[in-house]
Design a protein with these regions (language model features):
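Low-complexity, intrinsically disordered short peptide segments enriched in small/polar/basic residues
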Residues: 4-7, 49, 124
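A short Gly-Trp-Pro
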Residues: 51, 60-94, 100-190
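Polybasic, lysine/arginine-rich low-complexity segments
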Residues: 28, 34-35, 189
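Short, contiguous pre-domain boundary segments
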Residues: 34-55
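Bacterial Sec-dependent N-terminal signal peptides
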Residues: 1-31
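Short hydrophobic/aromatic-rich motifs at helix boundaries and adjacent loops
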Residues: 27-30, 40, 136
Length: 190
């Protein structure tokens, strides 16, 4: 038991040291790059709810490399590197692969895990839950309900009212402020 604790302590210390390093710019896109990436993606829509089915080759052509790696290859971005980790504007978070609404900003909280965390999805159908037994762990993977992009995982150690912690890779999230979302809603309605 003592040996296990020593190994765990060393591993945690090494992880903390590597996580504190600055992230590479390749993981972050400025808003201009993100907008042009959205324009190249024919399935990206914040209003269309139809299911998206594409081959991996098609996804590879339309998604930025960092989004493709996490969304389609079930990768994980480095903790504490997401621009949404310490981001608290009011609005809605969307799937970066297809534009599906995922979370309201009111459900975001600081879990200390290094990734954006939420306690409740925007709707029941916005997230798909899949058993994940990789890496010697038993977890529940979260996928986008529209395009099945890998988002992250959900754990049962979150705050009230749900007790859930949706630990999401920020690179697979897009964000629109409440004002932007309201404007698009009004334009769509007219």
């Amino acid at each position: 038991m003592r040996r296990f604790l020593v190994i765990a302590l060393i591993a945690a210390t090494c992880q903390q040291c590597s996580y504190s390093q600055s992230s590479s710019n390749s993981n972050k896109m400025d808003s201009t790059e993100k907008k042009s990436a959205e324009n190249l993606n024919p399935v990206y829509s914040k209003t269309d709810t139809s299911k998206v089915v594409k081959t991996e080759e098609e996804w590879k052509k339309i998604l930025p490399k960092d989004v493709y790696y996490v969304a389609r290859q079930k990768g994980t971005e480095r903790p504490w590197t997401s621009k949404y980790e310490n981001f608290y504007e009011k609005g809605t978070y969307y799937c970066a692969a297809c534009g599906n609404p995922l979370f309201k900003s009111e459900t975001k909280f600081d879990s200390g895990c290094g990734w954006p965390s939420f306690y409740e999805p925007i709707s029941k159908g916005s997230i798909i839950y899949t058993p994940d037994n990789t890496h010697g762990m038993t977890r529940t993977e979260t996928q986008c309900g529209r395009c099945k992009a890998h988002l992250g995982h959900v754990f049962e150690d979150g705050p009230p009212p749900t007790g859930l912690r949706f630990c999401i890779n920020g690179v697979v999230l897009d964000f629109a402020t409440a004002q932007e979302a309201e404007k698009k809603y009004i334009e769509k309605k007219d």
